């Protein structure tokens, strides 16, 4: 991810796709109930690492960008990325999370079974272990959380990007947009909470790239 930032910001390519799975958006800096910063099957938050590197002063080994926007679309809210970049307001970052939500998004029948890591989360009292339905509110202007219905669809994500994300991104005027794509939103994922096809991921990425052309000369890292 850091190498991708170098390539995009350095002008070697207009945008870049990093073959990383997962982006790590549940890994944060705050300890959760299991006394670790890793959670939700994520150990290293590559997206947050790339954003921090991009904005680090040149004298400290970074690239010195003023503003980076992270757009996260996934079944779950990216609690770790928000925790690292935006636990308090930081004018360098805008974090956008588009995720499943609503009262009908209640998880699996065994969601409170602490021994079943596949079931934990969603609307569970143990959601600190797997974040599930958190992220319905935005704590400050550096965060835009957009909970959708119970199933993530291309139509809903696309509409959110055009109607809610685009004005916010244009106002923020980032130097770089980083996409955090959650592939568990694929319609064939065994959890069954996503409705996206491979083509949908491509279309959503194209819409995000168009936002980048309008705001930061097309510089996108996914």
Predicted regions and their residues:
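Fold-level signal for large, globular catalytic cores of enzyme and receptor domains
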Residues: 2-13
